[in-house]
Amino acid sequence: RSRGLGDVYKRQVPGIHNVSNALACIALCSEYGIQKHIIKSALLSFTGANRRFELVGSYENITIFDDYAHHPSEILATAKALKNKTYRQSWIIFQPHTYSRTKSLLDDFAKVLTNFDNIIVTDIYAARESNNYDISSIDLVNKIKSLGKDATYISSFDDIVKYVRERACPNDIILTVGAGTVTEIGRKILLK
């Protein structure tokens, strides 16, 4: 039914999950009799959901994206989407979301974060919680290191900006990832 829409996958929105979403959209629109050229135009103009592999900007040929991912499966989808990009090294600046989630999914977070070349973890975004779980971002960094991958804990956003600006190179991709205030870092990197 959706013949003639094969080139619609040449979109700006990366990731196999977005291909699945596009296919669902095509199927639903086709079922409702929407013309193929309208479906194609809509999909080609779709730039993605806010804070889902969202382009923040670039400087010195270094590109910064922001993603709301705050669960290991979402971070894995982001890592897989990154494979569709051409880059020298990947940077993830991750802010865990809630103490309870970080504690219960510590091993899963550590494993998925090893998909990135450079890993920076900042303080847990507490949201509505108090830390009654005996967990910190340092525990996550240590777990990542136990898997044989280097990771860096940096609390201050300004220190993260300085660290990344001193080390990122042309053709690198930087991702700020998490449901909290980590989204501020990408813009701060651009402003320095």
Please provide the spans of the model-predicted regions.
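Alpha-helix C-cap/termination motif
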Residues: N84-K85, L147, R167, K192
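Short amphipathic alpha-helical segments
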Residues: A77, S104-L106, N132-Y133, R165, ...
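Thr-Gly-centered strand-to-loop micro-motif
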Residues: F65-D66, R128, I154, V177
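Short glycine-rich anion-binding loops that position phosphate/pyrophosphate groups of nucleotides
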Residues: P96-Y99, I124-A127, A179-V182
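Nucleotide phosphate-binding/pyrophosphate-handling subdomain across enzymes
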Residues: K10-N118
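Single conserved hydrophobic/aromatic residue that forms the stacking wall/gate
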Residues: R1-Y9
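C-terminal helical cap/extension that packs against the catalytic core
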Residues: A110-P170
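A glycine-rich beta-strand to alpha-helix segment
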Residues: D159-L190
